[in-house]
């Protein structure tokens, strides 16, 4: 089972925020996640990012592959 770290959309119409989740790569975007990693809210200025680094490290050690967007958020959060 290949696992991805990716975003799932939450919120209302035109007021979106995103949860960062670990999910089976074959599952649909709104499918049941294996774990919740954090969230990303682009609607506030500056954009709010909260990531549980321990969970991220755990999933990366298990071979999870982050999407390009999540990878950028991880880099931004590490600074």
Swiss-Prot record:
Which UniProt keyword terms apply here? Ribonucleoprotein, Ribosomal protein
One GO biological process this protein is involved in is: translation
Q: Name one GO molecular function term.
A: structural constituent of ribosome
Q: Which Pfam families match?
A: Ribosomal_S16 (PF00886)
Q: Where on the tree of life does the source sit, at the highest rank?
A: Bacteria
Q: Which SUPFAM superfamilies match?
A: Ribosomal protein S16 (SSF54565)
Record InterPro entries: Ribosomal_bS16 (IPR000307), Ribosomal_bS16_dom_sf (IPR023803)
- Name any GO cellular component annotation: small ribosomal subunit
* NCBIfam families, alphabetized: S16
PANTHER family documented for this protein = 30S RIBOSOMAL PROTEIN S16 (PTHR12919), SMALL RIBOSOMAL SUBUNIT PROTEIN BS16M (PTHR12919:SF20)
Protein name as it appears in the record: Small ribosomal subunit protein bS16
What is the name of the gene encoding this protein? Answer: rpsP
